[in-house]
Amino acid sequence: MGLPALEFSDSFLDSPDFRERLKCHEIELDRTNKFIKELIKDGNMLISALKSLSAAVQKFSQSLQDFQFECIGDAETDDEINIAQSFKEFSQLLNTVEEERRRLIQNADDVLITPLEKFRKEQIGAAKEGKKKFDKETEKYYTVLEKHLSLSSRKKESLLQEADTQISKERQVFYDASLEYVFKIQEVQERKKFEFVEPLLAFLQGLFTFYHEGYELAHEFEPYKQQLQFNLQNTRNNFESTRQEVENLMRRIRSAEQDFKAPGQWTMEGFLYVQEKRPLGCTWTRHYCTYEKGTKMFTMSNSELKTGGKQNGLIMSPPEMFKLKSCIRRRTDSIDKRFCFDIEVVERHGIITLQSLSESNRRLWMEAMDGKEPIYTLPALLSKKEETFLNEAGFNFVRKCIESVEARGINTLGLYRIGGVNSKVQRLMTSVFAAKAPADLDLDPDTWDNKTITSGLKNYLRCLAEPLMTYRLHKDFIMAVKSDDQNYRVCAVHALVYKLPDKNKEMLNLLIKHLHVVSTHSQKNLMTVSNLGVIFGPTLMRSQEETVAAMMNIKFQNIVVEILIENYDKIFHQAPDPNVPLPHPQSHSQSRGGARRSKAICLSSGSRKSRGLYPPALCLADADSDTFSSSPSSTPMGSMESLSSHSSEQNSCSKTGSPSRNKHKASGSLCWTTPSPSTNGPKSPACTTSPDSSSKEDANKTDGEWEEALSTSPGDRSSPASELLHRTLGETAEDQRSLSSCSSLTSLHISEGFRSCHGSIQSLVSRSQRDSLKSLHMPDLPPKDGMRFRDDSSASNGYQRPGSV
């Protein structure tokens, strides 16, 4: 029930009912005053919490900004460069959000606290002062009235008239105070309807403006997020392949002789103990020694292992270099130490006695110094009986495999990724390459299933005595794709292909043509160019040196294969440009190191356009809008091209964006589309089975087990998303933009209903198919300009939306 009205006429009567109604208004004003005090207190606590949150976010952002990624190897892929730069981009995004929050905090006191305090003090305070005056005049008036009424009628007339005049004045003062008090109370009650509510509305306006800014920043962040997600997918894919190769190398190292000599710069190197003669005997000091048999240079570096203090670790002194004259094994009975030998050098008189770590290690040093024995290497990867050759039987086998796959298995899910049973593969290889087998042996489809044939084809290529792309050109191919110039990568690989021997080039043409056909059916078999690169990269470009450094280049081997597949027609049907300079490892390594992060995708820094306040109602999404996501176009699960951006010809003037993309870019509203395959855009592998090295087969799984594993794989569980993805490839860019799917190749699983996902990027929420097909247009939101500029040019944390990613 509302407050009773106060009539001015009742002020003259001053009835108990009037006083009761007046008391109701006073109680309400007192309650309002207490509420405003509490509200101001809570508001100050909220502002303090916002300041603390802002400080914490800025500290977190600074930590991201200060961290520096370092990768193994002398060069980084575009994916690694973008990932290394991502923390700085995240920091920039957080700083931009905090810039808006700081504006909210700075304005909160003026918008919320000050107006409320002013209303409480000036309006409610004035009403309290009016009450004090009213109470004072009431008491004074009724006191005078009682005295006046107590006068005796026998008093003189002049005295009575004076008393009447005095009471009339007091009554008028009382009436004036009562009228002013009633007027002020009613004024305050009416003023609080707007002066009390307006500060709260203004504060919420600023708060929703901040939220709306975050909403728009999320839209601008969407293309970068998608590109970075593709980079993460590709890096994970390469990691799985490289890890298996490195693990196999570790096993071979473990199974090798204890004192094997790995290929390296020196003929022999390792720790030796050197005898140093003293006046009271001799000491043995550990040195790290190297020997180069070509120049006969022997180097000793004194090393001392500190076990504590600030110098914990290996302390190296400047090396001593000598030219070897002779090396003689030390007789066992001439010294009480084992494994010793003597050397003579030009720079010193007398002999230097050295102690090796074992008998076999001494033998290696002795053989190296007189040059009589070859270097011991790791166990051979292939036995002689396993080697295959580029002969007529090999070419016929490859052609038969390709014909069989293209005739009956081109649409098989996980083609070439899912291996056959090892025993069947070995039986196939034995029957085809047996000494008495005919050169034109056919592959019976009833005998050999598709998985066995594809595994046999990979096994043949893997077991070549020399990899198909040769050891001689291996480093040249690697350095070609390490270039920052997208066009140069393609042109350099093109030129190097024509330096291959004729048989190698012919076989490579045969294989890449087939892989190009396989990739064109990736909508069904899910074997994108990137997946094929991961499988065939280590097979076609096996490194001659079995080292960890060589394993780190597997990711670049995959890129070479991607370039060959994507540019098959150009590379194998057109002559290379004779003016293209071939890669030089030294120059490319230096240039890459100097600008290692300059090519990273980023959210361009720049000033942003200031905007007026958005009506709070416009910041609230309606029931049909995307309430929980900044964009319905979550990251696509996989385009049908290469995941990596390395093999795309971004700088080629002959390639342009798709018409649908250009149409959206000209629309003037915020409309991001997935880059077309013609651009240097993200190209994702589809969600199939776990990435596997091309040189590994599962010897334990049968065909049925593989099919069962595939049926429960993430790719199968996400089949609604896959079908949606494949269907949208032929649709407009608007539909592509609305596609919702998951990102991770290996660990991102999509539940039934396509509502949730988890994996390497857990923060990217997958939406349902119904939501994913919903248009991004929201009628309640104002159109977004292509670029926004802020008046405050000093703020460098803002960013404008990037161009095509």
Swiss-Prot record:
Domain of life: Eukaryota
Cellular component GO terms, alphabetical: cytoplasm
Site annotation Arginine finger: residues: 417
Any one of the GO BP annotations: signal transduction
Start-end of Basic and acidic residues biased regions: 694-704, 782-793
Domain PH span(s) in chain numbering: 265-374
Keywords tagged on the record: Coiled coil, GTPase activation
Protein name, per record: Rho GTPase-activating protein 42
Organism name: Danio rerio
Lineage, highest ranks first: Eukaryota, Metazoa, Chordata, Craniata, Vertebrata
